A protein has these predicted regions:
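Buried hydrophobic packing segments
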Residues: 48, 119-129, 158, 271-275, ...
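Active-site metal-coordination/substrate-binding segment of hydrolases
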Residues: 54, 77-144, 150, 161-163, ...
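Acidic-glycine-rich active-site phosphate/pyrophosphate-binding loop
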Residues: 87-102, 184-185, 189-191, 241-253, ...
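A common structural junction motif
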Residues: 85, 230-237, 278, 349-355, ...
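An extended, acidic, His-containing surface patch that forms the Zn2+-binding/catalytic region
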Residues: 252-323, 329, 333-345, 357-452
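Midchain, well-structured core segments that form catalytic/ion-binding scaffolds
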Residues: 149, 155-335
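Acidic/His- and Gly-rich active-site-bordering loop/insert found
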Residues: 2-110, 134-136, 251
């Protein structure tokens, strides 16, 4: 039986174990003693380590921040870092997000692709490599994190208490290979004076705001003008109702990850735009449309920039109203040739006027490995050797992964280019056939990394 056939025979077992992980709601929760990210992530980590133990690996739980499964001997460590925490469910799911549902090659559930499925792909790659009798001149360590989606504090803890990795990868992006990740910058826009009674939408800051409900005072003819304006947009659904002197606007856009906001439709942005087109005079509506708007390039805040590896992107993820003030979270992905200080300087003059203000939050520098570095070459070779695909080259992405938190690793798979796995959206899925192929690719990758 060749290796591909061996992987196929283990496929049902791997999917069953994925079901065990998907069944756990591992969103960030309220910290408890010994559970820094809440009960859900801690339970997912315990289950992930239990699966690894059942497969014969030594495991270590690092205070429920993260843990790892390990094989081999030696001082050097080939590391693989995935995460078991998930983003909020949100959206209109066809399937139960916490019950693995299989339809043909598709397996649905929150975390199937981001990132519980890839963690198991790496784990089974380790198992098959170990069982094949390959000499392990280094340790191979699969780290399971619990806080990737909300700050990667799990990897901060790993760096404090565990050994540095010699090289490795994180299975939390795309094939064929990621040799750079854009920097990250967060902003929040606030209203000063507004007639908007309430405006709320979005679930997470790192995804396009795909639903929004807005309440404004009624004006003669405004409802009809809003409906006419909304009818010309790319919204999936909209609804305008008028009652008791108020107009309520519901808008449903299209979700997308903040690293590729151009693939989505911002429900809040459409609402702001349509309010202005309909003649609703409001200071913050003007501010939003001028500084944020429907463009994803950051031009409104003076940040339009593009290098050979990609353009700066801007995404409005959440809109909410508290104490009469509207706030809009903004997620910006910064090209790899820009530094955080450069970005701050570029936008300083565009952060406030009489209609609103924008505060700069967290800023993180980009990550970049030269295309011909040994690490990039080793991983890319594994991908090409298994798939035969030489058309797609290593790339730079807008997403951020554990590669920015751990030394000497880059993101590597398992998503295929051009595929939409509904990550951070409803009906997230993974393909069983792609899981099997990823196991084979990760086996080859580990072997290549053992040799450098």
């Amino acid at each position: 039986m060749n290796m591909k056939e061996q992987i196929h025979t283990l496929s049902e077992e791997m999917i069953a174990n994925l079901g065990r992980l998907v069944a756990i709601d591992s969103q960030l929760g309220t910290p408890e003693e010994g559970k820094p990210f809440g009960a859900g992530p801690a339970k997912a980590l315990e289950e992930g380590l239990k699966i690894a133990e059942e497969l014969g690996f030594k495991t270590v739980n690092l205070d429920h921040y993260c843990g790892y499964a390990e094989m081999g001997e030696g001082e050097e460590i080939v590391g693989i870092a995935g995460h078991l925490d998930i983003v909020p469910v949100g959206g209109d799911w066809t399937y139960d997000p916490f019950k693995l549902t299989r339809e043909g090659d598709h397996v649905y559930g929150r975390g199937t692709t981001d990132d519980k499925g890839p963690v198991l792909e790496a784990l089974y790659a380790m198992k098959l490599l170990r069982d094949s009798g390959v000499k392990l001149n280094k340790r191979v360590r699969l780290i399971m994190g619990c806080n990737e989606e909300t700050g990667s504090k799990c990897m901060e803890h790993y760096n404090e208490v565990a050994e540095e990795l010699s090289c490795g990868f994180t299975p939390d992006a795309n094939f064929p290979c990621i040799h750079g990740e854009k920097g990250h910058m967060s902003m929040t826009a606030y209203s000063k004076n507004t007639q908007i009674i309430s405006m709320n939408g979005g679930f997470v800051s790192n995804a396009v705001c795909d639903t929004c409900t807005t309440v404004i005072p009624t004006e003669t003819g405004l409802k009809e003008k809003l409906e006419a304006s909304l009818a010309e947009t790319k919204l999936q659904q909209y609804r305008v109702t008028e009652e008791n002197g108020q107009i309520t606007i519901f808008a449903k856009g299209v979700p997308a990850h903040a690293s590729m906001p151009e693939l989505g439709v911002n429900a809040a942005g459409v609402t702001f735009e349509c309010m202005e087109k309909a003649g609703f005079e409001d200071d913050f509506v003007k501010f939003y449309n001028e500084h944020i708007g429907m463009s994803c390039d950051g031009a409104g805040v003076g940040l339009k920039f593009e290098d050979e590896y990609g353009a700066l992107t801007l995404c409005n993820g959440i809109v909410k109203t508290e104490d009469g003030i509207i706030s809009c979270t903004i997620d910006i992905r910064v090209p790899v040739t820009l530094k955080a200080a450069d970005v701050r300087t570029m936008c300083e003059a565009r952060l406030e006027d009489e209609n609103g203000r924008i505060e700069i939050g967290e800023i993180g520098d980009p990550l970049f490995f030269p295309r011909e570095s040994p690490l990039v070459n080793a991983l890319y070779k594994a991908y090409v050797d298994v798939t035969g695909d030489t058309e797609h080259e290593p790339m730079v992405i807008g997403g951020g992964t554990y590669a920015k938190s751990l030394k000497n690793i880059i993101a590597f798979g398992p998503e295929k280019m051009g595929m939409d796995y509904h990550i951070h959206s409803a009906d997230e899925f993974i393909l069983v056939s792609e899981m099997e192929e990823a196991v084979l690719i990760y086996m080859e990758a580990i072997k290549n990394l053992l040799a450098i």
